Curated annotation (Swiss-Prot):
This is Uronate isomerase. It comes from Lactococcus lactis subsp. lactis (strain IL1403). GO terms for biological process: D-galacturonate catabolic process; D-glucuronate catabolic process. It is an enzyme of class 5 (isomerase). It comes from the Bacteria. It catalyses: D-glucuronate = D-fructuronate; aldehydo-D-galacturonate = keto-D-tagaturonate. The gene is uxaC.
Length: 472
């Protein structure tokens, strides 16, 4: 088969029919990403491929380091073309890595350049693409609109003023840019900055934070504020998690110790985190939001690199907490007692957790369609095999037809072909079920499922268009 042909990843006739007739045409809702709302609003123009393709993309940075490229040409002050050339040389060696496929798919879809990226073609592609980047069609808003994206959910700190979301809500009519609340600084209370952060949270919420309860009250005010601008999700990273009972625990004392940078015991930290997540679950349910939990990841494990380059620069790895599903089961059991389980999407970076998690959440499904979901293959699992494994586990233990599908989790405006990649994998997976006689060869029935997973489910699940839909 020709590289990136029209039937790329589609290995049977049913798959080809499902993709070309049902998945390919569907719009996109990107409900979790790391795009900067300021860049969307300002509609900045990128000068060259390095700026739009390599800036902030730690997926690519890891490959460059594996190829011995000096840091100057990765995150340093090297010339932009030299950085791109280093990437082209690295890409030549990346067969089998999804970045090879994504990068060429992006080049083909956005720039209509059907050439292999290599050290030999780098200058030609650089010049051709940079000419196009100078046009308005390659500004962020045009890239979003032309990718048929209807909603972009950014990742935002509770203390954010959401000023660019406000401006975009007034001025942008082709798509929505909505905030998603991520309170990392309320979880990382041992980093030495907790007291300063509580001061910020108090100021922006207008609530004096005297202890744990008033901190939650301030957080609730931010939920209200985010909701007023279309917010419907919260997102939480728990690298590890250990449940701890919180009854009769002096949470104010733990909070005070953290503010004073005193060392917390493991038990105190676990009590605080459990109490915090339980309150966050309650707030998500109150505001009819969806809670996302990203678990079992080792972040910034290279200490010298963290000190020199910073966080989110490619020094993270899969976590190995073997009992994390058991600990999350205790959390959900407690929330069930309190009747505060919200709609939830669980992502684990360790595939060994997936079967445990999907069977666990099956014990806590509430009223409504698929309230609890196993999230799409995340980060290092954002591969053909990772996607297939997640689909197979979800289908075997729950209702695949209810799955809310793909997200980019990206910092790049050129990442939307990842939705196409996922849809091709999905159609091939389902097509194989048809070919094997495991599900009916019924286009109307199965085609609807493909369209639902591609777009309709996520449209209905999060309620981004609830007001518009109710007026129709």
């Amino acid at each position: 088969m020709k590289f990136l042909s029209e039937d790329f990843l589609l290995t049977n006739e049913s798959a080809k029919m499902l993709f070309h007739k049902h998945a390919e045409k569907m719009p996109i809702i990107d409900y979790h990403c790391h795009l900067e709302p300021a860049e969307i609003y300002e509609n900045k123009k990128y000068e060259n491929l390095t700026q739009i393709w390599l800036g902030g993309d730690h997926y690519k940075w890891r490959l460059l380091r594996a190829n011995g490229i000096p840091e100057k040409l990765i995150t340093g002050d090297g010339e932009d073309y030299e950085k791109f050339l280093a990437f082209a040389k690295t890409l030549e060696k990346s067969f089998g890595n999804p970045i090879y496929e994504w990068t060429h798919l992006e080049l083909k879809r956005f720039f209509h350049i059907d050439k292999l990226i290599s050290s030999e073609t780098a200058k030609e592609i650089w010049d051709e693409a940079n000419q196009m980047l100078a046009t308005d069609d390659f500004r962020p808003r045009a890239l979003i609109k032309n990718s048929q994206v209807k909603v972009v959910c950014t990742t935002d700190d509770p203390v954010s003023t959401l000023s660019y979301h406000k401006l975009l809500a007034k001025e942008e009519k082709d798509f929505k840019v909505l905030p998603a609340l991520r309170p990392d600084h309320l979880i990382s209370i041992t980093d030495g900055h907790f007291a300063d952060y509580l001061t910020e949270l108090s100021a922006v919420s207008g609530i004096e934070i005297k202890g744990f309860k008033t901190m939650i009250k301030a957080l609730e005010q931010r939920f209200e504020f985010f909701t007023s601008l279309g917010g419907r999700l919260s997102d939480h990273s728990l690298s590890t998690y250990t449940f701890a009972e919180t009854k009769n625990v002096d949470l104010d004392s733990i909070l005070q110790k953290a503010k004073e940078n005193q060392t917390l015991t493991d038990l105190e930290y676990n009590q605080y985190i459990t109490a915090l997540i339980l309150e966050i679950m309650k707030l998500n349910k109150k505001f009819e939001w969806t809670m996302q939990l990203h678990v079992n990841v080792n972040r910034s494990i290279n200490g010298p690199a963290l000190s020199k380059i910073g966080e989110n620069t490619g020094f993270d790895s899969m976590g190995t907490q073997a009992n994390i599903s058991e600990e999350l089961t205790k959390l959900f059991s407690k929330a069930a007692e309190l009747e505060t389980i919200p709609k939830t999407i669980l992502y684990s970076l360790n595939q060994n957790d997936w079967l445990e998690l999907v069977t666990m959440i099956g014990c806590f499904q509430g009223e409504g369609v698929q309230q609890l979901q196993l999230g799409a293959g995340w980060w290092f699992n954002d591969t053909k095999k990772g996607m297939e494994n997640q689909l197979e586990i979800f289908a075997s233990q729950s209702l695949l037809s209810n799955f809310v599908g793909m997200l980019t989790d990206s910092r790049s405006f050129l990442s939307y072909p990842r939705h196409e990649y996922f849809r091709r994998v999905l159609c091939n997976f389902v097509g194989q079920l048809i070919e094997n006689g495991r599900i009916p060869d019924n286009e109307a029935l199965v085609g609807k499922m493909i369209e639902d997973i591609s777009y309709n489910n996520v449209h209905d699940y999060f309620g981004f268009f609830k007001d518009e839909d109710s007026n129709q």
